[in-house]
Amino acid sequence: IIHNIPVRLTEKEQRLYELVTGFVKKEYWRRRAGRISILNLITYQREICSSSFALLKALSSGKEYFPVFEEILALAKEIKINAKMKKVLEILKNLDGQTIIFTEYRATQIYIARFLEKQGYKVILFNGGLTNSGKEYIKYIFQKQKDILISTEAGSQGLNLQFCNNLINYDLPWNPMKIEQRIGRIHRLGQTSNVNIYNLFTLDTIEEKILKLLYDKINLFKSVMGGMEKILMDGERMHNLEKDILSILVEANNEDELEERFAELGNSLQGVRDYEKNLC
């Protein structure tokens, strides 16, 4: 069962989002003119949709510096609780069984863990770099002793958790294949319970557009949950998709144009999927 959960940012979070997005838009054009990589800009925009803590860590430890970062960092430090975290707590209070929470960023993962532990939940973290035996150990501890497993993207490979039937996407990757991989951790052979997928998305942000693209345009969740249909898109195309999304966000002059360009992108992706399915 798919649950798309809207989250309204707090006033400070919304201001932070607008500051970051404004910087990204301005810097995008400068880099395009100088043929400079925009990968960091994609990262900043994704981090602010994940959590203020992910952005704070990136800007504090990054090699780049711009004067506006001072204002962004000061505001990020004022934010102690994210609106998404409050929503997760609401969801968890109404769930039966164990839950896996996915996030793309380690700083967000640590924030979620500390918050939930203070609320009395038994939490375990899962990251990349573990051996197969290490992964099996974490899986065993989660199954036997913990309520919630919080995993980063890097940790999801080779993780089979069919004993768990609740999954919360704390943030939404811009790559549909990563969503598919997340869901595949629990929606697989051996799963005996109904699977609940909770997709958090922040209103009036790029995240809302991403969910609409994945859910409405390419029917990602219906495809994966229904028949475990694989997304047949190569890594280069997915890399270009992230650039396309940022370009749309920056170049659209108004909300109508933003909607129109995302609709066109969705139609294009659906066309690619249909073509590649016919080749198989």
Question: What are these model-predicted stretches?
Answer:
Residues 2-9, 43-147:
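Conserved Helicase C-terminal RecA-like lobe
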Residues 10-14, 48, 54-55, 62, ...:
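Conserved nucleotide-binding/hydrolysis micro-motifs of P-loop NTPases
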Residues 193-280:
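C-terminal accessory region of SF2 helicases/translocases
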Residues 109-110, 149-165, 183-191:
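SF2 helicase motor core recognition
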Residues 159-172, 195-199:
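A short beta-strand element within the Helicase C-terminal
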Residues 1-74, 118, 240-280:
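Inter-lobe connector of SF1/SF2 helicase motors
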Residues 15, 57, 110, 114, ...:
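Alpha-helical elements of the RecA-like P-loop NTPase motor core of helicases
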Residues 175-197, 214:
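Conserved SF2 helicase motif VI
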